Amino acid sequence: MSTFIRGPICGTDNCPSRLWRIIDGRRTCQYGHVMEGDVEFNDDEDDLNGLGAGVITRRLNLTTNATGSFQSSQLTNSQLLQQQQRQSHKKFKKLIGHEAKLLFLKSFQFILKRQIRWLITEMRFPKEFEHVAKIIWLKILKTINDQPQEELKLQLHMTSTISILYLASTHLSLPVYTCDYIKWICTAKMPYFQASEILPKSWRIQLPNYYVSILEGSISPFNGQLYNKIALTCGMIHFKEFFNSEISCQGLLLKLVMQCALPPEFYFYTKQVIEFEETDIRNLTLWERTDERHTGRVSNHAELRVLSYFMLTINWMLSFDRDRQYPLKWILSLTESLTQRTTTSESIGRNIVKVVYPDKPTSSDYFQWSEEETLEFLKWMEKQFLPTQTKSLHNENGSMEMTIDQKIARRKLYKIFPLDREANHDGEFNDSTHQLTFIEDLQERYAKQTPFFESNKIRDSLNYQEANPPARKEAIGRLLTHIASQLLVDFAISKEQLKDCISRIKNACLHRMN
């Protein structure tokens, strides 16, 4: 029987003892309580030559962790993890059935509230936005509650949160569109990816793994998934019956014209084409869909119809102009400006969306980035993306479930490759270089177009000779291809979907002309 050794508090039945000794290989406090999981033996053979009898001894090894508490040196990491999991499962157990669905709805609402708070504080959305989003969410809950319990289907995903936010902004006629929400979630500014990490710890432990995976937002919406979800949400709550369903078409047109640095008159050209086909621009409203199995035609979505009108207007105006008002050199210069690599907030955001967007053909663009674009992407990866995938190194509140030993090991791991900006003296990540804003970049792009129109006025006073039609047609085709490639990424649709929508709108316009 060994002597007493001072150690951690026993705690069994509120036992205050700190004195421990070994009785029959088991660590026992002075009041007779046995410490669980702390029996260990040293089975190493002694020097048989030195011990004539060849006796094999078994010695008890006492080790302590970072806090000075006793622990077994022979317990593997998996055994320690199992002990911790058994202790945590005593407090929280996975919910099943109806209780699990209620907790999922509660968690979904918690994430939605965080997203709304971010939009109001960071993007300066009006305070009424929260009230409208709350009403839409309550209508969804009422629809779910009205279903029979035997056939209850939640039909909620992380894209459902974006749908609710988009519907609320549409009702308030805010100049915010799906491309904005896609950019915010892909750049990890708005809570979306790994959104389950912001839930309280007790909720995450009790929530079944199936629901946790839903709240993780594994990939960004693509191939028109967001538009289909918006249409389903509209049909679920009969959005048009209670809310304003007209999209801010003028704001979207202005956004497209400025993004492509087109002359301002293209805004009015496109608006006239829309009014010719739709009779009234206010007829562009959200589409409601109730059938989950059939997605319907992509041309039913109002925003995609505006994109199609915009592309058709550019094609028709430049094709019938015949080098009079918009010369061939200007078309070539505009195409070059769209492909030129500029380090602006918009270009960096589009590069990030291309990386996050699951589209294989865009992967070749990564090798064409400039050094500034690459550094900006790496900075975003460090500051925005990595914290959503793993708990931050300095965020101790987010890692309360980790033991002190695990925290110490994590710090040592991060010190192998320090990412601290202050430790880098080479100046490679220096932020002193000025980054052009969207307005400054737009002013430069418009300034470069001025000489082409001035020279065109001088040429009009002379004898006019029509430019080479095949060369002009090819240049227009390249311009439309570059504009379409940007729209595919910004609005998260496929090339086939955009082609189908443009074809249907074109046929409808030609049929109306006849």
UniProtKB/Swiss-Prot annotation:
Compartments, as annotated in UniProt: Nucleus, Nucleolus
Recorded consequence of changing residue 29 to A: Impaired binding to Pol I
Residue span of region B-linker: 67-101
Keywords: DNA-binding, Metal-binding, Nucleus, Transcription, Transcription regulation, Zinc, Zinc-finger
Region described as C-terminal cyclin fold: 211-320
Similarity field: Belongs to the RRN7/TAF1B family.
UniProt free text on domains: Although it shares weak sequence similarity with SUA7/TFIIB, displays a similar subdomain organization as SUA7/TFIIB, with a N-terminal zinc finger, a connecting region (composed of B-reader and B-linker regions), followed by 2 cyclin folds.
Role, per record: Component of RNA polymerase I core factor complex (CF) that acts as a SUA7/TFIIB-like factor and plays a key role in multiple steps during transcription initiation such as pre-initiation complex (PIC) assembly and postpolymerase recruitment events in polymerase I (Pol I) transcription. Binds rDNA promoters and plays a role in Pol I recruitment. After binding of UAF (upstream activation factor) to an upstream element of the promoter, CF is recruited in a SPT15/TBP-dependent manner to form a pre-initiation complex.
Miscellaneous: Present with 398 molecules/cell in log phase SD medium.
Protein name per UniProt: RNA polymerase I-specific transcription initiation factor RRN7
Source organism per UniProt: Saccharomyces cerevisiae (strain ATCC 204508 / S288c)
Gene: RRN7
